[in-house]
A protein has these predicted regions:
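Functional cores of ribonucleases/endoribonucleases
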Residues: 186-217, 226
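C-terminal structured interaction module
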Residues: 224-252
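Bacterial N-terminal signal peptides
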Residues: 10-20
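N-terminal low-complexity or amphipathic/hydrophobic leaders
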Residues: 39-103
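Bacterial N-terminal signal peptides that target proteins for export
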Residues: 2-12
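Long, positively charged binding patches that form subdomain-scale interaction surfaces
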Residues: 124-201
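Boundary at the C-terminal end of the N-terminal hydrophobic targeting segment
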Residues: 22-24
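Contiguous hydrophobic, core-forming segments of folded domains
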Residues: 83-146
């Protein structure tokens, strides 16, 4: 299926919104998603899939994504949408502009969290296994998507903001696999290395249902970092989590 563009036919907005609701049918925690990682990588089509103004913005809604044209990142914190434009050299966030669109976006709404202390320092592989183990213990199925968070300190942290510039390997496949360290210095993204940073990771776990759709193909985790004051944010490429951090899993 080709991507829908909202730039020229305002009437298509209702169709896109209807499609988004249809995609969310049967998914837990009011998960909605727009765009498709794998399809975008194959086609190179980075056109807008939904107006940011049309996204759910109720309190308790958390999400991640990228702007149309791959020229910025999106994070949603407790209902508040924030954009990190690729034009900002420091990765700072701002409110969405009136006509801004997302090429990729996924969010879920959580009314109650279960806090789980991280017992030791963990690299990304160990932490993601920990998330899955704790989610299963809470009664969540690993086949279905859910939103989660982790608050604390990150001894190793590399994140980026896409700039929309064309470069070798550009495209949201350039949203590098965060566990394997594919990110490097390129014209199509701004890289930020912040070892020891404090703040939170906002994540979407794809489950089998949405793997390759809301996450990088072959992965089930899509993570964005936001500092403690939510002044900077971007897509996480590599990270570790310090002992004492708090994993927040959705209950309802």
């Amino acid at each position: 299926m080709k991507y829908l563009s909202l730039r020229f036919v305002p009437g298509l907005l209702a169709c896109v919104l209807f499609a988004g609701v249809a995609w969310a049918t049967g998914l837990p925690f009011s998960i909605v998603h727009y765009g498709n990682f794998q399809r975008m990588m194959h086609t190179g089509d980075a056109s807008g899939q939904v107006m940011l103004a049309a996204l759910p913005q109720q309190p308790g809604t958390w999400g991640v994504g990228a702007t149309a044209g791959l020229n910025g990142e999106i994070v949603q914190i407790d209902g508040r949408l924030l954009v990190s434009p690729g034009s900002d050299a420091n990765g700072r966030v701002r409110p969405p502009q009136a006509d801004e669109q997302a090429v990729l976006f996924a969010s879920g709404r959580v009314q109650e969290w279960r806090d789980v202390a991280v017992p030791r320092d963990m690299d990304s592989t160990a932490f993601e296994a920990f998330v899955q183990t704790q989610a299963k213990a809470l009664g969540l199925t690993l086949e279905q998507p859910f939103v989660f968070r982790v608050e604390g300190r990150f001894p190793h942290l590399l994140w980026h903001v896409l700039t929309g510039q064309k470069g070798a390997g550009s495209g949201h496949g350039a949203h590098a696999s965060h566990g394997t360290g594919h990110a490097n210095s390129r014209s199509d993204m701004r890289l930020f290395r912040q070892p020891g940073a404090s703040g939170q990771l906002i994540g979407i776990y794809s489950g089998a249902v949405l793997e390759g759709v809301v996450s990088h193909p072959g992965e089930r985790f899509h993570l964005h970092f936001a500092d403690s004051d939510a002044t900077v944010s971007g897509h996480v490429d590599r990270y570790s989590v310090a002992a004492g951090a708090v994993l927040k899993l959705p209950v309802r």
